[in-house]
A protein has these predicted regions:
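Catalytic phosphate/metal-binding cores of nucleic-acid and nucleotide-processing enzymes, i.e., regions
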Residues: 1-105
Length: 105
């Protein structure tokens, strides 16, 4: 699956790193990436191009939720069981970080 489309690039360019500081769970989610065969969800809220790559920032869950940085190339290089790779959620209608979290979080 293509992790980066022209539409996503356009969103990234409008939301550079630190553009949603202080919004916390009210930050807009630009794209959701996920592991299709296990834990791993990345709610990307900000991004900046670095050479041929993108530095991403968002609310991520592997063992617990935490804010953090990663490179798009890191996600793209992950090789999962059965030949699977990290995928982009193309069906979600949720817009903010809070919309992806349990009610009591």
């Amino acid at each position: 699956m293509t992790l980066l489309t022209k539409q996503i690039i356009s969103k990234f360019e409008k939301h550079p790193i630190h553009s949603q500081d202080e919004k916390g769970r009210d930050a807009e989610v630009l794209v959701k990436y996920f592991n299709p065969c296990g834990t791993g969800t990345w709610l990307i809220t900000e991004a900046e191009r670095e050479g041929d790559d993108w530095r991403l920032f968002g609310y991520c869950h592997i063992h617990e939720w935490e804010w953090g940085y990663l490179m798009l190339s890191e996600l793209a290089s992950l090789r999962l069981p059965f030949g699977l790779t990290i995928e982009r959620d193309i069906y979600t209608a949720r817009k903010y970080v809070r919309d992806f979290l349990p009610q009591d979080a």
